[in-house]
């Protein structure tokens, strides 16, 4: 019985992770993020894989990136400023997108 519960719990977590990744990518598309970003190459802004690599292992990265996406800013990845995305993109959607980016 314990083995069955462990298998079910593990499968649930794996499927939830896949759903979050799909949700993050879909939200990035819907929110217009892909006008300036791409998963694997620089467009106007950095690629999402470059962002994930830069912040790999950084415990505070998610919170900082959520704020950066909300408020916008410049100077981190070059001279092109990132526009603020709040309130037009909901906070929970921004968090989902950032989690997806960091998972790449």
Q: What are these language model-derived features?
A:
Residues 6-15:
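Bacterial N-terminal signal peptides
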Residues 15-21:
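Sec/Tat signal peptide C-region and signal peptidase I cleavage site
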Residues 25-27:
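Immediate flanking context of iron-sulfur cluster ligation sites
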Residues 32-39, 97:
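The canonical Cys-X-X-Cys-His
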Residues 44-53, 68-98:
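Axial heme c-ligation environment in periplasmic c-type cytochrome domains
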Residues 100-104:
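Short hydrophobic/aromatic patches at helix-to-coil boundaries
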């Amino acid at each position: 019985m314990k083995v069955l519960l462990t298998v079910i719990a593990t499968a649930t977590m794996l499927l939830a992770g896949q759903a979050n990744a799909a949700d993050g990518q879909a939200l990035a598309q819907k929110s217009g993020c892909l006008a300036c970003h791409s998963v694997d190459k620089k467009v106007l802004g950095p690629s999402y894989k470059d962002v994930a690599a830069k912040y790999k292992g950084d415990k505070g990265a998610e919170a900082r990136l959520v704020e950066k996406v909300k408020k916008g800013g410049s100077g981190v990845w070059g001279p092109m400023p990132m526009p603020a995305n709040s309130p037009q993109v909901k906070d929970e959607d921004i968090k989902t997108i950032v989690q997806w980016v960091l998972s790449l």
